[in-house]
Curated annotation (Swiss-Prot):
Organism: Aliivibrio fischeri (strain MJ11)
The encoding gene: argS
Protein's name according to its UniProt entry: Arginine--tRNA ligase
GO BP annotations listed: arginyl-tRNA aminoacylation
InterPro entries in UniProt: aa-tRNA-synth_I_CS, Arg-tRNA-ligase, Arg-tRNA-synth_N, Arg-tRNA-synth_N_sf, ArgRS_core, DALR_anticod-bd, Rossmann-like_a/b/a_fold, tRNAsynth_Ia_anticodon-bd
Gene Ontology CC: one annotated term: cytoplasm
Family listed: Belongs to the class-I aminoacyl-tRNA synthetase family.
Gene Ontology molecular functions: arginine-tRNA ligase activity; ATP binding
HAMAP family linked: Arg_tRNA_synth
Motif extent ('HIGH' region): 122-132
Pfam family, one: Arg_tRNA_synt_N
SUPFAM superfamilies documented for this protein: Anticodon-binding domain of a subclass of class I aminoacyl-tRNA synthetases (SSF47323), Arginyl-tRNA synthetase (ArgRS), N-terminal 'additional' domain (SSF55190), Nucleotidylyl transferase (SSF52374)
Length: 577
């Protein structure tokens, strides 16, 4: 149950009954401090101002008609007109009981939408690097959350599998195949292969002529070029899949929807834009001038959709992409997890899409932009030599560092188990370190913080789960076979249950805002509340069996909530660390 939403509806009804205009926002929020209750309604002051009445007097009118029977134990007016709402222990206990009995932990499914999520999008014939990490794991966490809420989600891995560079790549692949007969080993170092192809193109004119010829042949559907192109795509995606699998990312080859997929749509789209009078010729190119965007002279900005040589641009592909996702995938909502530097480019493409009538306003096109991963020097994260960090190398180093950490803490565990723990902690640390930061900000990549067992980190959260699970293993009990009822008799119990009941609010916030850090913040707060509860409220050695059973239920619900929350982030838990 979403308690915030429930109370918001109740306060909205009371506002209207007290004389507020219909649809006035109740603005119910979780209270920042316990002294202000569990929730606070902040909408009264805005309404009172519009009505020209005293906010505290209007707040009292709202309270007089506010029906929170069976939900709140107390309400009060605070400050200039805030309404503080304190949930009743009986209500919280009842909700906790229901959540524990439900495999979804009380989280309701939403009305299903068709949602397309565009994320990861590496380039063919290049290895994934750290720059691909944020899109990949942020997108995947949001997708998992949307699916948990019952939505039909199409994962779209918009790989860079088209362009003039494929001429030189195909020419080099052909050269290797003629010389060695087998290419798979040669392509194990994709970056090296790409650099070699570029060097040959720049230095060998005969090679360059062949390469340019292959660009034309590939675009016209030549069988040999198509076969070579497919080989490059296949080898690249096999390597990318290793990274996805290591990171516990749910993308597969079936989710690939590369740039090439939209090739047949590009010429008809330009023709249609011309027909509608949106695209006009300018210096030999086809250009759409947008009043919404001005150049430095204050004139409408021109967006090229076809070059004078007949070639198309990324913008043309993005127009086709949005059109396809609406017309063929029936999208109600399209989420793009793309670097913030691409924002204007996307906005321009979508402006054209709307003007041309390809995607109606009822379909939400959303750019979930993100900042950069920086080194400790505050610059883009690089190798010591100043090169781009390969994602596979980053994950290898994470595993090595985690293995040392686990060895120091648990020397006596079997080697196989230590290796499993190290791998799980390493991947979790890399992901959580990123996901716990606000998506739109740049962040400093720091191994020490990432692998720390204190603070809002993956090791801390994984250990928090293990700590709760160990209560049951010590007692030889199953979390699913507990008896008795949840009874709240202590302030620490109430604080823990109130936080547990905010899980659905966190899930829905991640889904609507595309912000996984909200789930990380929630789980970290929950772990903190459990710590306070655990220190103040004895569980296994409690002499009152009813209290013991109730607290075991709260511990079980905490463990299940942490596990489910981490699963939505694509992070695995461990039964022991």
């Amino acid at each position: 149950m979403n308690i915030q939403s429930l109370i918001n509806d109740k306060v909205s009804q009371a506002l209207e009954a007290a004389g507020a205009p219909a649809g006035s926002p109740a603005a119910v929020r979780q209270s920042a401090k316990a002294q202000f209750g569990d929730y606070q309604a902040n909408g009264v002051m805005g309404v009172a101002k519009r009505l020209g009445t005293n906010p505290r007097e209007f707040a009292q009118k709202v309270l007089d008609v506010l029906d929170l029977d069976g939900i709140a134990s107390k309400t009060e007016i605070a400050g200039p007109g805030f309404i503080n709402i304190f949930l009743s222990e009986e209500f919280l206990a009842k909700q906790a009981e229901a959540a524990l009995a439900d495999k979804r932990l009380g989280v309701a499914k939403e009305e299903q939408q068709n949602i397309v999520a565009d994320y990861s999008a590496p380039n063919v014939a290049k290895e994934m690097h750290v720059g691909h990490l944020r899109s990949t794991i942020i997108g995947d966490a949001v997708v998992r959350t949307l699916e948990f809420l019952g939505h039909n989600v199409t994962r779209a891995n918009h790989i860079g599998d088209w362009g003039t560079q494929f001429g030189m790549l195909i020419a080099n692949l052909e050269r290797i195949q003629k010389e060695k007969g087998e290419v798979s080993m040669e392509l194990s170092d994709l970056e090296g292969f790409y650099r070699e192809s570029k060097k040959l193109y720049d230095e060998d004119e005969e090679f360059a002529v062949t390469a340019r010829g292959y660009v034309v042949k590939l675009q016209s559907g030549d069988e040999f070029c198509a076969e070579m192109w497919k080989k490059l795509v296949d080898v690249t995606m096999v390597q990318n899949q290793r990274n996805y699998d290591r990171l516990n990312v749910s993308l597969t080859r079936d989710n690939v929807m590369g740039e090439s997929m939209y090739n047949s749509m590009l010429a008809p789209i330009v023709a249609d834009l011309q027909k509608q009078g949106l695209a006009v010729e300018s210096e030999g190119a086809q250009v759409v001038f947008l009043d919404e965007y001005k150049n430095k002279d204050g004139e409408p900005m021109g967006v090229i959709v076809q070059k004078r040589d007949g070639g198309f641009l990324y913008t043309t592909t993005d127009i086709a992409c949005a059109k396809y996702r609406y017309e063929e995938l029936n999208a109600d909502r399209v989420l793009y997890f793309i670097d913030s530097r691409q924002h204007q480019h996307l906005m321009q493409a979508w402006t054209i899409v709307r003007k041309a009538g390809y995607v109606p306003e009822s379909v939400s096109l959303e750019h979930h932009a993100f900042g950069m991963m920086l080194g400790k020097d505050g610059r883009p994260f690089k190798t010591r030599a100043g090169g781009t960090v390969r994602l596979a190398d980053l994950l290898d180093e994470a595993e090595e560092r985690a293995a040392k950490l686990i060895e120091e803490k648990n020397k006596d565990l079997p080697a196989e188990e230590k290796a499993k723990i190290a791998t799980t902690v390493a991947m979790a640390a890399v992901k959580y370190s990123d996901l716990s930061k606000h998506r739109t900000t740049d962040y400093i990549f720091d191994w020490d913080n990432m692998l720390a067992f204190e603070g809002n980190t993956a090791p801390y959260m994984q250990y928090a789960y293990t700590r709760v699970a160990s209560i049951f293993s010590k007692a030889g009990l199953s979390m699913d076979e507990l008896t008795g009822e949840v009874k709240i008799t202590d302030e620490k119990e109430k604080a823990l249950v109130a936080k547990l009941m905010q899980f659905e609010e966190a899930v829905q916030a991640v889904a609507s805002e595309g912000q996984p850090h909200l789930m990380c913040a929630y789980l970290f707060e929950l772990a903190g509340q459990f710590s306070s509860f655990y220190e103040a409220c004895p569980i296994l050695n409690n002499e009152d069996d009813a209290v013991k059973q109730s607290r075991l239920k709260l511990a079980a619900l905490t463990a299940k909530t942490i596990k489910q929350g981490l699963e939505l982030l694509g992070i695995e838990t461990l039964e022991r660390m």
